[in-house]
Regions:
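Generic structural marker for isolated residues within well-ordered, non-membrane alpha-helices
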Residues: 152
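A short acidic Gly-Thr/Ser loop motif
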Residues: 120-127, 133-136, 145-149
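Residue-level detector of high-confidence beta-strand sites
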Residues: 141-143
C-alpha cells in the first residue's frame, strides 16, 4: 500500500465530473507504475477542492482544481501472473484481485467513522494485520507473524495444558481498548 497525491487544474471554475475522478485515478496508477508490481486498486482517502474543503464526494462540486489523496494497492506481478495462468486453465475468462484488509474495513467500519483515521486489527491464527483506514482507502497497512495460534501455544506452555484446553481458555479472554464514547 502506498499513498499518492495527484491534482487537476481545470483552468476555469466548473463542476467536477466522474471523468475527472477517473483521470485522477489514472494519473495515480501511471505515477505508481513499477516493473515488479501491478496496481490492484486505487481508492480515495480524501479530495481537496481548491477552496480548501475536504470531501469524499466531490462530484458536482464547483471548483477550479481538485487534489486527490489516494491509496494505491499493489500485488507482486509474479503472483498475479501465476494466478491468471491457473484461472485461465480452469476456463475462467477473468479474475478480480482485491485487498482483503480494505474489503474488511469498508464492510465493517461505518463510512462516518472512516472520515477520520480508523483502525482495524485482524488477528489471524499465524499472522495479524493492522489497517489504518481513511475515507475509502487504506492509509497504511502492516502485518506481522504473531497470531492467535501463538497465544494458544503460549497458554498451553504456561499452564501445562493441552492445545484444545488452551484454545478454549483463549476464547474466554476478552481484550479491549476503551476509547472515547461519541
Amino acid at each position: 500500500v502506498k499513498r499518492s497525491e495527484v491534482s487537476i487544474n481545470f483552468g476555469t471554475r466548473r463542476k467536477i465530473k466522474q471523468a475527472d475522478i477517473d483521470s485522477l485515478f489514472y494519473m495515480a496508477s501511471e505515477k505508481a507504475k513499477d516493473s515488479s508490481v501491478e496496481v490492484v486498486s486505487v481508492n480515495p482517502i480524501s479530495y481537496i477542492i481548491d477552496d480548501g474543503r475536504v470531501t469524499l464526494e466531490p462530484i458536482g462540486e464547483n471548483a477550479l482544481s481538485i487534489t486527490a489523496n489516494l491509496s494505491i494497492i499493489y500485488a507482486d506481478k509474479k503472483f498475479i501472473e501465476m494466478f491468471n495462468t491457473i484461472v485461465a486453465g480452469l476456463d475462467y475468462s477473468s479474475v478480480e484481485y482485491i485487498s482483503e484488509p480494505l474489503a474488511q474495513a469498508l464492510f465493517i467500519i461505518p463510512k462516518e467513522r472512516r472520515e477520520d483515521l480508523a483502525l482495524l486489527i485482524d488477528v489471524g491464527d499465524l499472522t495479524s494485520s493492522i489497517s489504518f483506514v481513511k475515507g475509502d482507502g487504506l492509509y497504511a497497512l502492516t502485518s506481522f507473524s504473531r497470531g492467535g495460534g501463538f497465544i494458544t501455544n503460549d497458554l498451553a506452555d504456561a499452564f501445562d495444558i493441552s492445545i484444545n484446553e488452551a484454545d478454549k481458555l483463549k476464547r474466554q479472554i476478552v481484550l479491549s481498548v476503551k476509547g472515547k464514547q461519541s
